[in-house]
Amino acid sequence: MFGKILTKLFGSRNDRTLKSLGKTVTKINALEDEYEKLTDEELKAKTTAFRGRLESGETLDDVMSEAFAVVREASKRVFEMRHFDVQMLGGMVLDSNRIAEMRTGEGKTLTATLPAYLNGLTGKGVHVITVNDYLARRDAENNRPLFEFLGLSVGINVAGLGQQEKKAAYDADITYGTNNEFGFDYLRDNMAFSPQERVQRPLHYALIDEVDSILIDEARTPLIISGAAEDSSELYTKINTLIPHLVRQDKEDTEEEIGDGDYSIDEKAKQVHMTERGQEKVEVLLTERGMLAEGDSLYSAANISLLHHVNAALRAHTLFEKDVDYIVQDNEVIIVDEHTGRTMPGRRWSEGLHQAVEAKEGVHIQNENQTLASITFQNFFRQYEKLAGMTGTADTEAFEFQHIYGLDTVVIPTNRPMVRKDHADLVYLTPDEKYAAIIEDIRGCRERGQPVLVGTVSIEQSELLARLMKQEKIPHEVLNAKFHEREADIVAQAGRTGAVTIATNMAGRGTDIVLGGNWAMEIEVLTNPTDEQKAKIKTDWQVRHDEVVAAGGLHILGTERHESRRIDNQLRGRSGRQGDAGSSRFYLSMEDSLMRIFASDRVSSMMKKLGMEKGEAIEHPWVSRAIENAQRKVEARNFDIRKQLLEFDDVANDQRQVVYAQRNELMDAESIQDTIVNIQADVVNGLVDQYIPQQSVEELWDVPGLQTRLEQEYGLKMPVQEWLDKEDDLHEETLRERIVDTWVKSYQAKEEMVGEQVLRQFEKAVMLQTLDGLWKEHLAAMDHLRQGIHLRGYAQKNPKQEYKRESFELFQQMLETLKHDVISVLSKVQVQAQSDVEEMEERRRQEDAKIQRDYQHASAEAIVGAEEAESLSAHTPVVREGEKVGRNDPCPCGSGRKYKQCHGKLT
């Protein structure tokens, strides 16, 4: 109450922010008359002048007003489009590490040109990030004339480009591309073998379009570059035949009784669990097929792989549905993005799930994968020096943007008032009643000439509605993952008189639905259109536009509530753009997923109290409130999962940053001789300590063991016992010096034989290859650790602390192994000439070329399990990296040790 009074008196935080920025808009507007009088050459020269001022010490804030005014004037000349004042506000928000919420149709693409130009002046690179290749190409080509007019270069980074093409794209002032491609290029750069193979520059400024989709929806799906592991397709096929024999539990276990069945499904958590009865049945079936020894348990250590395959097959059959979660196309299982409804070719589920789905569908089973490199979008984007984003729906997730990324959200007012009518939800008892009402509503809209966009949550639902409309002889277009090639065309014409378009979820997002149809696209398809043809198309469009406005504008019809309010708002936001007329309504049934899982009891009791009968709908604020509360529950749960994923990945991220920094230092260094000398000393001292402990008597020395180890692992034949027998004054310290000295002389002899330059190159190649191999094994070990770590909660231990401690121990072991392996290879291998080094590098490149780079969307289920054992801890706010860590500074991983004794050991 008190807060509301303060807001009335002083305005909300958003109002105060906009008021402050409004002063700068006034300055920009004051420059408009002056810049209108400039010639094209004088306007273009402003770019050179701005760059000169920045080089002399001025900041971007100092030149912002003038730069924005220049972009506005250039846009008027190139596009015949003038930036509105609200777009100027949006541009300033985007330049200040914040998120701008701008409604659909308010010109986000044009708004982005302002901060992109301003930050492009620095020459450090601007990355404008979109959700798919089509939008990246479209926005780059649309805005290229403006940026090139002002002297800035534009690059496009999409899948399928060669190394040189990618490098050219990244060297441009402004680079458009998809989030996946930027992330994978970062990982690929950190798998490179020479500086010339890297394509990215340091990450400077990222401007993310549809920021909620990328930073929220995709946050649970880490990017993984993987290579094919062993072939186990036959095992997946055999295990797949077991699942039809299992029966779902008819009721959940309670204290009084045990449900009758082999497995139970937790729909809220999207998990499946085998019951004791199910485990016994699977063991019998496996034994019958000769896959399990008589009397052996599925849960014994030797059968963990079998258990993994059974669980994957069970999940594939019970939790993943064809035409909802994936489609089968060209003998391949292709994932459907649950948030956008688009297919994701090349993406694969991890942990054997994709192979299990392939076995279920009877298509070719591809090999399992081994992780070579991975990162979450959260940790990738937090590496940018500046980060900003824009979307039509960010306010509902404002807390998460601030909490995880440190980004405030500013709601930008619309240029014209919003007049769309959002009707209350209609709730029916059954889906049949709901679909009958939807068809009736569509028929009414068609009679009025009002276009309709029908939003569905799955391909299956969109095809069901399409069949119903066909039966009713209602002309319609279907836009889902199966027909994404025609996406832009279908969306562009969805605003024509009486048009009916069925769209899966938010497929088609990023393309405006223009009332009366998109006249610009009609002109585009013509070859050299005359002015008369263009004028006729525009005249015809104006007639259609007026008819549609008179009929009520675009009507949005939702067939089910999504588990996120934001996705529902995105669907509604397709109507009412730039002050257009429009309306929206959601039709629900008690059997919808959200209603069944979260809201059924409360709403059912309300319906009974109101005496509902078949075919009747309920429309009441109580129902809308109950549904919204259900959505809040799901949003809170999903936020917790994303937060946990980040907390776990932060541990791996510290290690990732250290390894990648070391790789880059190794690649950039002309010589790593000093590093090799330091490692050599560490290895020798550690080895001698094992067999001849410091300050110990000779009786405790294991000289034969030391000699054997030196010869077997390092190829060094040292007569240590002979030295001791002949020289009475040889004690532990002088013996250590003798061994080191002999080792160094042996290595120097190798250097004299092959030449210093060849050996320096060979050292670098060995160090990189060994580090890459061990890092790959370390990632696999971390995956295994994470998958079972939640069980520590049942032993009254904190899973996150245990994960942090054990992963640090694994990392320490990896560093020690790296030292020993590198010195072992350098000591034993005989390098004959430069050609040996080149052959080694070529072999590495050939192996790299064979890697099947499956870009996986990994599941976060192992992390979700930690919820059962541990309550969520408070999350540490994100702090962007500052200066380089000194060797004597505390290690950033939080171990309490000095950096040089912890993650800095390699340096």
Curated annotation (Swiss-Prot):
It is an enzyme of class 7 (translocase). ATP binds at Q87, G105, E106, G107, K108, T109, D512. Zn(2+) binds at C891, C893, C902, H903. InterPro entries: Helicase_ATP-bd, Helicase_C-like, P-loop_NTPase, SEC_C_motif, SecA, SecA_CS, SecA_DEAD, SecA_motor_DEAD. It is found in: Cell inner membrane; Cytoplasm. The keyword Membrane applies. Residues 878-887 have a biased composition (Basic and acidic residues). Its cofactor is Zn(2+). Its EC number is 7.4.2.8. It catalyses: ATP + H2O + cellular proteinSide 1 = ADP + phosphate + cellular proteinSide 2. Belongs to the SecA family. Monomer and homodimer. Part of the essential Sec protein translocation apparatus which comprises SecA, SecYEG and auxiliary proteins SecDF-YajC and YidC. This is Protein translocase subunit SecA. It comes from Shewanella sediminis (strain HAW-EB3). The lineage of its organism: Bacteria, Pseudomonadati, Pseudomonadota, Gammaproteobacteria, Alteromonadales.
